[in-house]
């Protein structure tokens, strides 16, 4: 079971996303189900280390946002063209 911490994004847009990436974080979103979509930010190093493990893309993940757990699966991943970094991840509620 994978557990990842995240924070709700206060500011959205291209400039805010670039500032996140410069701070070694990246934007992501959780959508699906009855609840509204949630824009989040995640730590680059922690998620990169998790995504190299075998079941990251197939198993149900737990994302902890402000103490509340969300069960999700990875829907789409955008990676940097040549750096070992994630640009954006879409999660769908499980």
Curated annotation (Swiss-Prot):
- Do you know which InterPro entries this protein is assigned to? Rbsml_bL25/Gln-tRNA_synth_N, Ribosomal_bL25/Gln-tRNA_synth, Ribosomal_bL25_short, Ribosomal_L25_dom, Ribosomal_uL5_bac-type
Which cellular component, as a GO term, is one annotated location? cytosolic large ribosomal subunit
Kindly indicate whether the keyword Zinc-finger belongs to this entry: no
Q: What is a biological process (GO) this protein takes part in?
A: translation
Q: Does the keyword Ribonucleoprotein apply?
A: yes
Q: Name one GO molecular function term.
A: structural constituent of ribosome
Ordered alphabetically, the record's keywords are:
Ribonucleoprotein, Ribosomal protein, RNA-binding, rRNA-binding
Q: Which family does it belong to?
A: Belongs to the bacterial ribosomal protein bL25 family.
Q: What does this protein do?
A: This is one of the proteins that binds to the 5S RNA in the ribosome where it forms part of the central protuberance.
Q: Which proteins does it associate with, and in what oligomeric form?
A: Part of the 50S ribosomal subunit; part of the 5S rRNA/L5/L18/L25 subcomplex. Contacts the 5S rRNA. Binds to the 5S rRNA independently of L5 and L18.
Q: What is this protein called?
A: Large ribosomal subunit protein bL25
């Amino acid at each position: 079971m994978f557990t990842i911490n995240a924070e709700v994004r206060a500011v959205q847009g291209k400039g805010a996303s670039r500032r996140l990436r410069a701070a070694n974080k990246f934007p992501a979103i959780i959508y699906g189900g009855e609840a509204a979509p949630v824009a989040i930010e995640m730590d680059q190093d922690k998620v990169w280390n998790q995504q190299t493990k075998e079941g990251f893309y197939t198993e149900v993940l737990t994302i902890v946002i402000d103490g509340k757990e969300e069960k999700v699966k990875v829907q789409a991943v955008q990676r940097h063209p040549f750096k070992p970094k994630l640009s954006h991840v879409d999660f769908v509620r499980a």
